[in-house]
Amino acid sequence: EFLNKYFAEKASLYGLKLMVSAGPTHEPIDPVRFIGNHSSGKMGFALAEEAVKRGADVTLIAGPVSLETPHGVKRINVKTAQDMFDACTGNFDKQDIIIMAAAVADYAPIEIASEKVKKKAEDWNIELKKTKDVLGWIGDNKKVNQKLIGFALETENEQANAFGKLERKNLDIIVLNSLKDEGAGFQHDSNKITIIDRNNKVTSFELKSKQDVAIDILDTIENY
């Protein structure tokens, strides 16, 4: 009985289902080239690992990254924005908490060459199309009892843009990163965040390891 009580106190997310997306997407141009971004997936993986420690049943939707799957996490690998959309929308309905930490491409090539495109003398113009807005779709379709958390990476008017995204996407909480903060953001093992919720509460944190940032984010979600 003592052990059950101890683990119940430690496992604050026990019995809850949590989905987190992580990493970039790669939008192919031809068999060897793609449009991508610098996301490492480290923040999303840290969140998945911390959520499992708290007893959650975790599904991790991972873009193309070279990271080991945290113990106890169900991992679904995806490559493109369309893959990410399909995996996230296909799994969101049964989740209690949804954390969308992936950096999903906003645009993808209209045409994908079946063979490697050879270098030519002239310029190469690639026409792009908008990808499906996975965060917006989940925001439009989420149930009252589901908590939806998004991320914003901004370079100017950071808080104003984050508040706007919070409203547009029907989020409960948004985690703001700034490219202006040294040691934070893509590729780093540390991050510096500001968390904003629908009650207009704004909490800024110092630079920390992404493991400690994951603790701050999940603490905020639990107390929301």
Task: Label each region the model flagged.
Residues 32, 44, 48, 88, ...:
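Generic hydrophobic/aromatic pocket-lining and core-packing "Φ" positions
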Residues 12-80:
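Glycine-rich phosphate/diphosphate-binding loop of Rossmann-like nucleotide-binding domains
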Residues 19-23, 100-102, 152, 177-178:
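Short beta-strand segments
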Residues 1-19, 109-112, 177-181:
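YjeF_N-associated NAD(P)HX repair module
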Residues 109-206, 211, 215-219, 223-224:
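Glycine-rich phosphate/nucleotide-binding loop
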